[in-house]
Amino acid sequence: MMLRWLWRGLLALIVVAALGVAVALWRFANYAPADPAIAPDAAAQALFIDDYAGARQAFLAEGDALAARFQRVERFAIPVASAQASGLFVDGLYVPAQQSPKRLIIMSSGVHGVEGPAGSAVTRLFMQEFMGEAALADTGVLLLHAINPYGFARQRRFTEQNVDMNRNAAQTNALYLTDNAGYPLVDSLINPTQPADLGAVQHRLFLLRAVGMIGQHGMGPLRQAVLQGQYAFPKGIYYGGGALAPQLQALA
């Protein structure tokens, strides 16, 4: 009798555990946070331009206005070649201090291309509201618009070559020889070899695989392995490349 109850208890635990895993997987696959009830500011919202070409033209127009107001304004455009898009540039605008130079502000946007609309909006707001006569009397400003224009245009974080620009800038080539020893542990987990498919077995088992890996190696080392950036897996995430990106070479 005791053995029978033990078996029943064990089966009940297995069923409860299976249900818990099923619920966790379902919530993981269907998670969608509710949008907050915030009334957008129409004037501020107008600054956000989703498409790269439109944002670039808006930046150039603001540059025209500043060039008409201030002296010795310099402008440049660095073309960025692409096999998938055209008309890509890193645009620069330099407004020197108009009277007695004491400091220089450098502002860039779109290092992670998909963040470009927000960065462009903030840049143009800065141009409209902060680049006035008083501020520019002793302070110069250098603006760099869309460091990663391909990512901006294609709504991708990385460049066309999958390079994370935030981990690409280096004073010497030693950076590109950096060994991220922990990254191979997580590469197979976070970079599936098959096209994305929410119904695939590897997706359904992702949570269990992740929990097992955390239990084996610890959250800290795994987080460090991912966020540190890596230079050995060109198709992996946070890939820093093997040399300066062409637009950074031009800026250097």
Tell what function each PLM region has:
Residues 2-252:
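Structured catalytic-domain cores with a bias toward divalent-metal coordination
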